[in-house]
């Protein structure tokens, strides 16, 4: 494994253990050249998934890109990083086990929306504002009112 600090090719694994959800292996490594320590995560990749963007371009599924977009939606919210990790891992697992080699970007967005719906209303609205391309304050108001309506008890 290449050292992120000096670029040296070899590192030594000092500690290895499964993550909380068991979906990855966390490895503590030390560079053999500069001695820097860093952490890597090893995950099983069941299938290579290609994402079809709105413009028709195709690109490999990028877990880190999905993670960043969810983290941005959850920024400054009382949400534990481990919960975000589980949410992203769950979506990735669904994609890899779906049997499809290609998936529309809009389908991934819908999966994130569905996961965030029961997660945190503010994060849900933030993600929706990008996913649904809100352009005016009225778009936020209309979307927020659907959440409020859904949350009201039936009389």
From Swiss-Prot:
The keyword Nucleotide-binding applies. Residues 7-24 have a biased composition (Basic and acidic residues). Pfam families: ATP-cone, Zn_ribbon_NrdR. A zinc finger (unnamed) spans 3-34. Residues 49-139 form the ATP-cone domain. GO terms for biological process: negative regulation of DNA-templated transcription. One of its GO terms (molecular function) is ATP binding. Residues 1-24 are annotated as: Disordered. Binds 1 zinc ion. Keywords: ATP-binding, DNA-binding, Metal-binding, Nucleotide-binding, Repressor, Transcription, Transcription regulation, Zinc, Zinc-finger. Its cofactor is Zn(2+). InterPro entries: ATP-cone_dom, NrdR-like_N, RNR_NrdR-like. Negatively regulates transcription of bacterial ribonucleotide reductase nrd genes and operons by binding to NrdR-boxes. Belongs to the NrdR family. This is Transcriptional repressor NrdR. It comes from Sphingopyxis alaskensis (strain DSM 13593 / LMG 18877 / RB2256) (Sphingomonas alaskensis).
């Amino acid at each position: 494994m290449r050292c992120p600090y000096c670029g040296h090719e070899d590192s030594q694994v000092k500690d290895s253990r499964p993550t909380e959800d068991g979906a990855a292996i966390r490895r503590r490594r030390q560079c053999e050249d500069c001695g820097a320590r860093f952490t890597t995560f090893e995950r099983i990749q069941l299938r290579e998934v290609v994402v079809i963007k709105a413009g028709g371009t195709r690109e490999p599924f990028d877990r880190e890109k999905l993670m960043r977009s969810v983290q941005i939606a959850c920024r400054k919210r009382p949400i534990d990083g481990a919960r975000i990790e589980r949410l992203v891992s769950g979506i990735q697992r669904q994609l890899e086990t779906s049997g499809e080699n290609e998936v529309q970007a809009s389908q991934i967005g819908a999966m994130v929306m569905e996961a965030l719906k029961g997660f945190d209303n503010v994060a849900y609205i933030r993600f929706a504002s990008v996913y649904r391309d809100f352009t005016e304050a009225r778009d936020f108001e209309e979307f927020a009112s659907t959440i409020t309506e859904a949350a009201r008890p039936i009389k």
